[in-house]
Amino acid sequence: MALARGSRQLGALVWGACLCVLVHGQQAQPGQGSDPARWRQLIQWENNGQVYSLLNSGSEYVPAGPQRSESSSRVLLAGAPQAQQRRSHGSPRRRQAPSLPLPGRVGSDTVRGQARHPFGFGQVPDNWREVAVGDSTGMARARTSVSQQRHGGSASSVSASAFASTYRQQPSYPQQFPYPQAPFVSQYENYDPASRTYDQGFVYYRPAGGGVGAGAAAVASAGVIYPYQPRARYEEYGGGEELPEYPPQGFYPAPERPYVPPPPPPPDGLDRRYSHSLYSEGTPGFEQAYPDPGPEAAQAHGGDPRLGWYPPYANPPPEAYGPPRALEPPYLPVRSSDTPPPGGERNGAQQGRLSVGSVYRPNQNGRGLPDLVPDPNYVQASTYVQRAHLYSLRCAAEEKCLASTAYAPEATDYDVRVLLRFPQRVKNQGTADFLPNRPRHTWEWHSCHQHYHSMDEFSHYDLLDAATGKKVAEGHKASFCLEDSTCDFGNLKRYACTSHTQGLSPGCYDTYNADIDCQWIDITDVQPGNYILKVHVNPKYIVLESDFTNNVVRCNIHYTGRYVSATNCKIVQS
């Protein structure tokens, strides 16, 4: 009886187990390949010694066509390194801009050309500036949202965001203005408002190790996540050194940098921080105006005030400068043999500093006058004869640079003129600028040469007989424009051949090459023989100079009728 009862119970258990297995197999067969809790694909790679894993619960091949929202798979990125705990919460954080889907687009698509962002192509939410991804504890939050059948059966749009409101860094200063918004936020106002909210229930756990299943898990109600992790920094691998802690930086100035008002301007409105003069020590009263401050004052003010060693953006003490000098009338140099009035030597020295046309004078006691000196070697170096037709000398004929026979009625354009060409270089070795004597509004414009003539007679060119000293050729008055062609080392070019800046600076040269118009003497009617070439600069002494005995150059000329040679060029008194 007992044996029969036991065998009956055993048979019932066997049939019950078979029935359970059969029912479970029938229920698992329809969804056998779509278990969302099973990882079906695994991709592993190694970067800098760290192993990363990408897991996918979906199938490897996805058929074409719209996919149902129930068949969405999960993707998980594991193996991100654990952030070191030593990094402070105030360290700079990395921002990540996820892509927001447009209506009718799959969440993985990006829109090129519609919104550019420093993080790459794609849509950016309106709060991308105020959200930080990740923190020093190695935790991050993400959310997922699945839009169900937008626009009547279109593909489901998936948006993944790694932004979390709990990790927003609150500034330590009071907020006076709202956060600035990106200019392209208005393009996406038709989004689902639910996609802009944050799901506080989703938590992404970063694993402690680098293995595949080392505790990496994601729990989401929607079942579709894209936990994008920021790239690991160098110090997170243990190879970096301890970084200094810096205060957090936001869109507004940190409280550690308070506003400093600018210093008040000096009373006279002049910046005297770099006004030290190399010539001030030689003037009388320098020690009284600039007493020796001593080492204590130098340390207090940052250096010797006489040398302008003041801290940046600071005004020097007003007592370090002497009182301003009263403006004196300009000194007009005139040649007079009258005796100077009492105290005239002192007054003349002070007036000479403001002399007309005086710019550079190392000697403060001199009046400052120019001194023109022609170069005899330059004239002798390249003197030659040129034959040219009259039609090619029309510009020179307008300026009266030819002999009188060139203007005769019987002269034709095919007549040949013989020209004695030579260069000229004049140096101003004085202590003041050589300026034109004519006012600027009276300068003469020559349209053929396209420049202004600021002087009527700058040079005279004459050819004299070597035996008698008489003129054998009709020279002319060269009225070129004055300019600084070249300058000695340490001198700057300040004048040019323009309508308002003509002159000759001290230490500079006004050069006229032998191939320019009017740099010649017309010797068409001169017979071969020995002659003297005379070049006279500032011939009528209209502009006052410090020395008039060095303005003339004489050269011995031997003319054969075919060529010419110049010898023994030197400076003479007249």
Swiss-Prot record:
GO BP terms in the entry: aorta development; collagen fibril organization; protein deamination; response to lipopolysaccharide
Homology family: Belongs to the lysyl oxidase family.
Region (Interaction with FBLN5): 311-369
Localization per record: Secreted, Extracellular space; Secreted, Extracellular space, Extracellular matrix
Binding of Cu cation, residues: H449, H451, H453
Region (Disordered): 62-123, 239-374
Biased composition (Basic residues): 86-96
Region Lysyl-oxidase like, annotated ranges: 370-574
Post-translational modification: The lysine tyrosylquinone cross-link (LTQ) is generated by condensation of the epsilon-amino group of a lysine with a topaquinone produced by oxidation of tyrosine.
Name listed for the protein in its UniProt record: Lysyl oxidase homolog 1
Catalyzed reactions per annotation: L-lysyl-[protein] + O2 + H2O = (S)-2-amino-6-oxohexanoyl-[protein] + H2O2 + NH4(+)
Coiled-coil features, chain-numbered ranges: none
Biological role stated in the UniProt entry: Catalyzes the oxidative deamination of lysine and hydroxylysine residues in collagen and elastin, resulting in the formation of covalent cross-linkages, and the stabilization of collagen and elastin fibers. Essential for the elastic fiber homeostasis and for their maintenance at adult age.
Cofactor details (free text): Contains 1 lysine tyrosylquinone.
2',4',5'-topaquinone found at: Y512
